[in-house]
Amino acid sequence: GGGNLPPLFKQKEIIYVGRLDCNQKRVLRILQTWALLEQRYPDWRLTIVGDGPDRVNLENQVFESQLENVSFEGFQNPRGYYERASILLLTSEFEGFPLVLPECMSFGVVPAVYGSYSAVYDIVEDGKNGLILPYDKKGYNAALMAEKLSVLMQSSDERQRMAENAIVTSRKYSLDSVYQSWEKLFDSLF
């Protein structure tokens, strides 16, 4: 990173922001990944922001797995969560263009995503501004994602470096930037 940003005062918190729908969003994968991390990192927590048809099932899963540092916040404006969280975990099977990525990155939240759809690779550069667990036709590997997350959870310097890069990347998706791209396109057409 450029090292020109002040240190981000982030909490040791991983968030998920989105619909609680296990079919597309695969939120259960987030809990499976967290289950491998919680005891190793007792000072970290997982916060799930959003609501949907699978909320009760997911809450039951947390209870049955005896996970303690997990909270379900329901449907909320995510801004306050973006301001304080260090990492966003997204394990969807498919997405169009996940707006949550540039949105969270603009607050210096480092995205950790499952690379199961192409838009991820347009936004996140693995090891630079976030983490990508490559798609595997055998399925999502929670243990591998937990390993990738561990590196970030252990090093505030790594988190700061990637957070700064995430902020820079997010600027490409600001309204001004998108507007200028459209303007250039139209100018080239007419």
Where are the regions that the model predicts?
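Nucleotide-activated donor-binding/catalytic signature segment of Leloir-type glycosyltransferases, i.e.
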Residues: 56-75
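Short alpha-helical segment that forms part of, or immediately flanks, the ligand-binding pocket
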Residues: 79, 98, 102-106, 121-122, ...
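Short alpha-helical donor nucleotide-sugar binding micro-motif in glycosyltransferases
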Residues: 75-76, 81-85
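A short, well-ordered alpha-helix in the C-terminal region of glycosyltransferases
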Residues: 151, 158-172, 181-184
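Short hydrophobic beta-strand element within catalytic cores of glycosyltransferases
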Residues: 110-114, 119, 124
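Aromatic "clamp/platform" in nucleotide-sugar-dependent glycosyltransferases that forms part
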Residues: 93
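A conserved mid-protein helix/loop that constitutes part of the nucleotide-sugar donor-binding site
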Residues: 12, 21-36, 53-59
